[in-house]
Amino acid sequence: VVYYYCNGNLYARRRPYRKMLVRSKNQQLWQNRFSACISFYRSLNGVCLKPIWEKLGKLMSVNGLNAFIASNIQAFNGEMGISNYEEIHFSKGVLKVPMGFEIRERKGNKLKVCWDTGWQTSLDAGTDRLCVGVIYDDEPLRPLLAENVTGIRSEGMGMIELREGITKCYHLYCYFMSRDGR
């Protein structure tokens, strides 16, 4: 028996034992989904999104990894890839993302995005800056933050610059971050 403290409470559990091999296809599928989700989370290390998940985890009384997995595991498939890009959450927060996000103009690797500012104008969130996560189809488990992104929530528009030579499909994840990084 192993005794340990977590959040000020004393717990006991069995001593770890050697893991059994996965037997069913369904178990293998979920094990692969879990591995892909963890790989994706680890790649967020250099993208400065881990602190967002760590803060959310503290609110949920879990660690950041568990908060990320609970929010994103459904997006991954059993082949160590992403099956549903719409289910990916780069970040989570209490403020809603504005309605009517759309790409209005594309010139080379630069995109102009616009959104409806209607209900946010009276909120303190009007000074939040636009952030954009990018997943390229040729590297689905390596998310990046778009560099050279401009846009403030209250302005209703922003510019995004993607990496040069984009020929394949990519997925954009727009969210807003306060000036102090929350």
Question: For each predicted feature, which ranges?
Answer:
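Charged linear interaction tracts used for macromolecular binding and regulation
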Residues: 57-182
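Long, polar/Ser/Thr-enriched low-complexity segments
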Residues: 1-99
